[in-house]
UniProtKB/Swiss-Prot annotation:
This is Large ribosomal subunit protein bL19. PANTHER family: LARGE RIBOSOMAL SUBUNIT PROTEIN BL19M, RIBOSOMAL PROTEIN L19. It comes from the Bacteria. Keywords: Ribonucleoprotein, Ribosomal protein.
Length: 115
């Protein structure tokens, strides 16, 4: 990587990111701007993927809201996310959990592991 680009991105990397993987349930505190007001919106769900590396790393969180699946993709190092809390760790054998989109109810549960 170009040394100039590398030096610019190192200053923007966040150090307060917890260790989480696909299958973990996380609570994301995202900043939402509505007009002139800014508030924190909590989005809690299962991490179904992580992709990329460095400043461009992203993760996708899926939750069921009103019987409908909702997915949001967040950059890991964005200032729009106030904090990320890991609620529980899940035991999965895949890096991408896109198969959860087709499952409903108890079939979509992920076994919890103690870390």
């Amino acid at each position: 990587m170009n040394p100039l680009i590398q030096s610019l991105t190192e200053g923007q990397l966040r150090s307060d990111i917890p260790n989480f993987r696909p299958g973990d349930t996380v609570r994301v505190h995202a900043k939402v701007v509505e007009g002139t007001r800014e508030r924190i919106q909590i989005f809690e769900g299962v991490v179904i993927s992580r992709k990329g590396q460095g400043i461009s790393e992203m993760y996708t969180v899926r939750k069921i809201s009103g019987g409908i699946g909702v997915e949001r993709t967040f950059p890991i190092h964005t200032p729009r996310v106030d904090k990320i809390e890991v609620v529980r760790h899940g035991k999965v054998r895949r890096a991408k959990l896109y198969y959860l989109r087709a499952l409903q109810g108890k079939a979509a549960r992920i076994k919890e592991i103690r870390r």
